A protein has these predicted regions:
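Histidine- and acidic-residue-rich, metal-dependent catalytic cores
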Residues: 2-301
Length: 302
């Protein structure tokens, strides 16, 4: 048997050690990642968000000098942090304007919903803190519990920064995404209040040195984020797609053809609309498979 050990034995009152057969870990990881992927497809503006947050988490955890298993565990938490958004109504997710106070309150339920979703899963102990606490703040003004600096896990501190940075640099229906420099300034202005001071400072240094550039504005390594030229949301190009394949806007149903040449990717509108079958969510099993394999090998403690 293999032991998967959470770094902090006091995160929450569940198993301290998880015993899993070697051949079981990858399917268990994949079950969580695919679920998170399907939740993300509900919001046409967030394509690639979970992948980017996971990559930022990995880089920040590495920069902090954490052990390989901890880096993988926190990156996994980054990929799964928004599971609870399955409970958010479509009208709220897709609203082309700022949310009302009531709508924002409904959004604030997603950490607890996400934590309930993973209850009973054999790997829940690895990710529950990232899911439940990624909107908590050092100044105690976060949610859902208003935890203060002395009660925040490493997971929540890292995912909070990475999630906020990606949110700031991503376009929403009511605003364009910030530049890298603007987003780093936003983090700097909120050190010790919204964000951990030490972790945030290191993240800012990473951004200023160009170490985030290959993730920013991408939906996978080497695949720049594409947007619908008709209405604006993200149109995801998967790594196994080639020139001549189609991608679709899940907001207006517009179809576009993919062009790959000279290491560049472009999508060209066809003027057509996707069929109901074409608009079904597609899971990028190549991206997920690579993430799962990397995570599994790092998480295993013999």
């Amino acid at each position: 048997m293999i032991s998967l050990l959470p770094s902090s034995k006091s995160w929450f009152e569940i198993e301290k050690n998880i015993k899993i057969n070697h051949h079981e870990i990858e399917p268990l990881l994949q079950s969580l990642i695919v679920m998170a992927w399907m939740v993300e497809t509900r919001d046409p503006y967030t394509g690639g968000h979970l992948w980017r947050v996971a990559q930022y988490c990995r880089l920040l955890a590495e920069a902090l000098g954490l052990e390989k298993s901890e880096v993988a565990r926190i990156a996994l938490g980054g990929f799964l942090h928004d599971l609870g958004k399955i409970s958010v109504p479509d009208a709220t997710l897709k609203k082309p304007a700022r949310l009302s106070d009531q709508e924002y309150e409904s959004i604030k339920n997603h950490p607890e919903v996400g934590a309930r979703i993973v209850v009973g899963h054999p790997l829940a102990a690895l990710v529950k803190s990232a899911i439940l606490h990624h909107h908590e703040r050092p100044d105690g003004a976060g949610y859902p519990y208003g935890l203060d600096d002395g009660n925040l896990s490493v997971d929540s501190r890292i995912v909070s920064i990475c999630d906020a940075f990606d949110a700031m640099t991503s376009t929403r229906p009511y605003r364009l995404g910030m530049s890298l420099d603007q987003a780093l300034k936003g983090i700097k202005m909120n050190l010790h209040t919204q964000f951990d001071g030490n972790f945030g400072h290191i993240f800012i240094e990473m951004g200023q040195s160009g170490r985030l550039n290959h993730i920013l504005g991408h939906t996978d390594l080497g695949i720049p984020l594409q947007t619908c030229l008709t209405c604006g949301p993200t149109m995801v190009v998967r790594r196994n797609q080639k020139t001549g394949d189609h991608t679709y806007c899940h907001n207006c149903s517009a179809e576009a053809v993919i062009e790959k040449s000279n290491n560049k990717i472009e999508i060209i509108p066809t003027g057509l609309k996707g069929s109901s079958k074409a608009l079904q969510p597609n899971v990028d099993f190549d991206l997920i498979g690579e993430f799962v394999t990397t995570s599994a090998s790092a998480l295993i403690v013999q």
